Amino acid sequence: MSRPRRRGRDIHGVLLLDKPQGMSSNDVLQKVKRIYNANRAGHTGALDPLATGMLPICLGEATKFSQYLLDSDKRYRVIARLGQRTDTSDADGQIVQERPVTFSAEQLASALETFRGDIEQIPSMYSALKYQGKKLYEYARQGIEVPREARPITVYELLFIRHEGNELELEVHCSKGTYIRTIIDDLGEKLGCGAHVTYLRRLTVSKYPVDRMVTLEHLQTLVAQAEQQGVPAAQLLDPLLMPMDSPASDYPVVNLPLTSSVYFKNGNPVRTTGAPLKGLVRVTEGEDDKFIGMGEIDDEGRVAPRRLVVDYPA
């Protein structure tokens, strides 16, 4: 029996999309997938509809390595409205409490300090975390509050930008799993006035260059240009993609000779020189350093395959 025909293109890489405000991460993901006519696509860490900024979208085989971006650090710029608390901790929610803003500059500085470093955070009910197989925001929309455990996070930097009237602007560099809305809500309670997010922009994810971000409008413009020029849209779109192994760029590289990579790609651990003593590694083959997957150093010092790239026929 012949294999079913694959729909769309076998295109592999990571697009750094500048997500627009007012759209869900899944909505923009589906638009990018259609624009690229890609077989597979997935994003790495959803942004709220209110938020804008860097949303890495993995296409094709790059989706196998998206988990490594979920685990990476991120940087945000956030503006909070002081004096009002909402049920979602952002401007999309309903105001549930209003209080005067009376704190001093010293009290603000002291409160901000408590959010720096290793802290614990109780996730918002309006999050995609699951409880008994159901997303928290689904419970919240039904008016049901369920128990949530505090989770360890790290805030590497919490920079004060400005405080004007009832607006507070901050920049946050944080670890995976950090909810900026929750930081703002908790900060508002610590200051005694309440607060919610009115503006949120993700500035960076991992070490991806900011100047490689593109908008949906730019992608659509390139498609129109390609049509006018009589060339395939892929000719203008594909150069925008980052390499498929870029989500795992923080991991060391182990290069295998072609004689060893054959065994590795067949699921077998192989011995090689220059490998670290333990941990995950990016594995390449041959003199051109072609990426073939992720490996892990086993107890015998061999490189064992963990996620492999599939070579699709052209």
UniProtKB/Swiss-Prot annotation:
The gene is truB. GO terms for biological process: mRNA pseudouridine synthesis; tRNA pseudouridine synthesis. Belongs to the pseudouridine synthase TruB family. Type 1 subfamily. GO terms for molecular function: RNA binding; tRNA pseudouridine(55) synthase activity. It comes from Salmonella paratyphi B (strain ATCC BAA-1250 / SPB7). Responsible for synthesis of pseudouridine from uracil-55 in the psi GC loop of transfer RNAs. Gene3D superfamilies: Pseudouridine synthase, PUA domain. This is tRNA pseudouridine synthase B. It holds the Pfam family TruB-C_2. The keyword tRNA processing applies. Its EC number is 5.4.99.25.
